[in-house]
Amino acid sequence: MSTTTQNIPWYRHLNRAQWRAFSAAWLGYLLDGFDFVLIALVLTEVQGEFGLTTVQAASLISAAFISRWFGGLMLGAMGDRYGRRLAMVTSIVLFSAGTLACGFAPGYITMFIARLVIGMGMAGEYGSSATYVIESWPKHLRNKASGFLISGFSVGAVVAAQVYSLVVPVWGWRALFFIGILPIIFALWLRKNIPEAEDWKEKHGGKAPVRTMVDILYRGEHRIANIVMTLAAATALWFCFAGNLQNAAIVAVLGLLCAAIFISFMVQSTGKRWPTGVMLMVVVLFAFLYSWPIQALLPTYLKTDLAYDPHTVANVLFFSGFGAAVGCCVGGFLGDWLGTRKAYVCSLLASQLLIIPVFAIGGANVWVLGLLLFFQQMLGQGIAGILPKLIGGYFDTDQRAAGLGFTYNVGALGGALAPIIGALIAQRLDLGTALASLSFSLTFVVILLIGLDMPSRVQRWLRPEALRTHDAIDGKPFSGAVPFGSAKNNLVKTKS
């Protein structure tokens, strides 16, 4: 940017079309967050009506994560070939239909399947909305674009908590899911009123359709084997999370099978850059493992361990969700100022100071608990708002939506594991201690993975000929792309 441009307030760098694109995507993400967290709010009610164990109830949260990898792949490929806008609309219709089906579910299996549909739609919404907004905004504002967008999910969670306190005590838990059909109306408006992303139009205007990840995996020479592996992964995940397997060794074998399948898909679709893709999946996996025990089981902790009534639960969740939303926006500013990776690490380190006090204070003072949760979620969860920007920078425009959607949503299986791990640990410890221990320990893993730029570092170690040295979204250098102590290591000193 020139000095003159730098003196202009950041928001004036955006025209009306760019703001409209952002507003539409943000509202879509708000509705996504609203629909997705409903199950966490009514988990105890559903558990009681269906007669579920704690682990079975937690698996209803996990179900949406099981299908996300496939939804991210398919809807991401749709976004790469036909445009980000169509993928956004399709995603909203999917998760809205799944939410409505939850309201009619007669039992556990039906609700589990409906949650699978929600997961597919959520995955598509994440990948398509993130790439849509990031590619529509100027390069120097793309951390803000990412952070501001993801704040919509947290705002949706806040709205859901408030609606829960008004609806469920009067009409019951099913009424909450019936409201989830409303986003379909919004999807119809989106289809006619928002422009296509600028980067995608420039790349594909007047050109033949790109060869997407779906083309490579399901229309190429290995299509039969890949279809079989897809069915195998889906079956393995079903048994892991809904099959009530008691043998840890069998679960471990099925988990390793899924990991091998996902790595195979990444190798086929990204070629020599597979080490980067695999490490991005690992980063996201641990990001979900540290954050989603709290996201998924906080309402249960408030209602059971602290014995809060629905109104008090809604108030505390307001602080938590609003803190995460504010953190997404703050993370966007920090990312554009410090650089994406440095902002991520600093924010997570600060959040570590608060995680133990949140669960040590107990329930005597609701306001103090709410304030602690606000700041902990602002620093620990909110910084994930710039994760789409971080991941998207490793992929070219041709495969960005599918690449972001697939890597993020395979890693998001950590969100499926997280509530179940939390519930299992809570069988030996109290739930608050289990949540604090998981979050505190696993956050350090994410700090190391992102701080050391392990995707670039592992790419350099294994396939250096395909190493990308600069972020494909904002053009800034990757710190892990250069050996430490190299004459070219001035990249490390540059914001990245």
Swiss-Prot record:
This is Sialic acid transporter NanT. Keywords: Cell inner membrane, Cell membrane, Membrane, Sugar transport, Transmembrane, Transmembrane helix, Transport. PANTHER family: CARBOXYLIC ACID TRANSPORTER PROTEIN HOMOLOG (PTHR23508), SIALIC ACID TRANSPORTER NANT (PTHR23508:SF3). It holds the Pfam family MFS_1. Belongs to the major facilitator superfamily. Sialate:H(+) symporter (SHS) (TC 2.A.1.12) family. It catalyses: N-acetylneuraminate(in) + H(+)(in) = N-acetylneuraminate(out) + H(+)(out). HAMAP family: MFS_NanT. Coiled coil: none annotated. Catalyzes the proton-dependent transport of sialic acid. SUPFAM superfamilies: MFS general substrate transporter. Gene3D superfamilies: MFS general substrate transporter like domains. GO terms for molecular function: carboxylic acid transmembrane transporter activity; sialic acid:proton symporter activity. The chain crosses the membrane at residues 22-42, 58-78, 92-112, 116-136, 148-168, 170-190, 224-244, 247-267, 278-298, 313-333, 353-375, 406-426, 431-451. Disulfide bonds: none annotated. The keyword Flavoprotein does not apply. It is a multi-pass membrane protein. GO terms for cellular component: plasma membrane. It is found in: Cell inner membrane. InterPro entries: MFS, MFS_dom, MFS_trans_sf, SA_transporter. It comes from Escherichia coli O6:K15:H31 (strain 536 / UPEC). The keyword Ribonucleoprotein does not apply.
